[in-house]
Design a protein with these regions (language model features):
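Canonical positions in the second alpha-helix
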Residues: 283-284, 317-318
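Terminal, low-structured helical/coil segments at or just beyond the last alpha-helical repeat
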Residues: 324-351
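N-terminal nucleophile
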Residues: 22-260, 264
Length: 351
């Protein structure tokens, strides 16, 4: 199985361009006040939906707020390493003027005296991309006194409509795996970006570890639409021991996954498939563990399955969080009819 997976990934990478710098030392702090976002990211354009997106992870605080920039119908930017946060708005403005991503990257880096410590990636709404990695992002010759010694790789892997890039990475395999995962993805852009980040981490990710992550996806408003939402997904995890797991959870909430799981759980229960129904509802609660509606639905599933103890326990969780809502609802709910005579149930639902 492992050998077959490697073959599949290798095949996917045939259309990917890989460029890199590999060294034994990596800068972990930039010059002056610019924060260091030693990180990996992916920028992408989906011609089928006209969505533009950025996904990022870093062993630095708040990468999801600092690295990604995007404007619907124009382009997306990831600015990292010793991040120049002016790159984002400048690059977007230049794309709007008609410059190509390659021209944009050259313009903004030529104007920046600190460019040697920068890494920036730009993609436009035609799917063209360009990446710049400064020569001091990983530098064998810089004064060792100014460096924290880490194994590191800096570079990118680009293909049609996307580019994956990073620095202070475990190896070139990080960006290769991101590229393969994005190309193989079948879900929404946000899900494909998430899959790419997970794939990069599976190959070692940032050599320093994990702390923050984010996903930004934008889309032009349809003509004659009542919608005012151009940011389809705008989520981030600023400081977490498991940022990938937490970002996936938040993404699932954003995409309405818990609601779909609850609907499926209810349908399975109607079909008498109680074990499957309970399993689906547990998934919904894992994604949104503080949601009393999910707790109440799980109590319903247990009641339908005849598990009185678990039904009362989950119902108690929901009622304690929102007694005014769930007490009267549970008292009138036919799903709990068989529990109505129990003292424990009466204690939960009576005023």
């Amino acid at each position: 199985m492992a050998a077959m997976s490697r073959i599949i990934i290798a095949a996917l990478l045939l259309s990917v361009t890989v460029q890199a710098q590999d060294a034994r030392q990596a800068l972990t702090a930039g010059d002056g006040p610019d924060p260091w976002f030693g990180t990996f990211s992916i920028i992408a354009f989906d011609p089928a939906t006209n969505e533009l997106g950025v996904g990022v992870q870093s062993r630095a605080f708040g990468a999801g707020a600092a690295v990604p920039y995007a404007k619907p119908g124009v382009g997306a930017v990831a600015t990292q390493a010793s991040a120049n946060r002016q790159y984002g708005p400048k690059a977007i403005a230049l794309l709007e003027q008609g410059l190509s991503p390659a021209e944009v990257v050259k313009r903004i880096t030529d104007e920046d005296p600190g460019r040697d410590t920068r890494q920036v990636a730009v993609i436009d709404a035609k799917g063209r991309s360009a990446v710049y990695t400064g020569k001091r992002v990983i530098d064998r010759n810089h004064d060792p006194k100014d460096l924290v010694h880490l194994g590191g790789f800096a570079g990118f892997a680009a293909g049609p409509n996307f580019s994956a890039q990073g620095n202070t990475l475990a190896s070139e395999d990080v960006v290769k795996a991101m590229a393969a995962a994005y190309q193989a993805g079948k879900g929404s852009m946000a899900e494909r970006l998430m899959d790419a980040l997970d794939a990069g981490q599976s190959e070692g990710g940032d050599t320093r570890g994990m702390q923050s992550a984010g996903i930004l996806v934008v889309k032009p408003l349809p003509a004659n639409s009542d919608s005012t939402v151009e940011r389809i997904v705008d989520i981030r995890v600023d400081d977490h021991e498991e940022p990938f797991k937490e970002l996936r959870r938040v993404l699932n909430m954003t995409l309405g996954v818990p609601n779909r799981l609850t609907e499926r759980s209810a349908q399975l229960a109607k079909e008498g498939k109680f074990a499957e129904a309970i399993a689906e509802q547990k998934k919904a609660l894992e994604i949104n563990p503080r949601n009393e509606q999910a707790m109440y639905a799980l109590a319903q599933r247990y009641a339908q399955a005849g598990d009185t103890k678990q039904a009362l326990e989950q119902l108690g969780h929901a009622i304690r969080r929102q007694p005014k809502q769930w007490k009267p609802q549970a008292a009138a709910d036919p799903i709990f009819a068989k529990l109505a005579s129990l003292p424990e149930f009466k204690k939960l639902v009576l005023p």
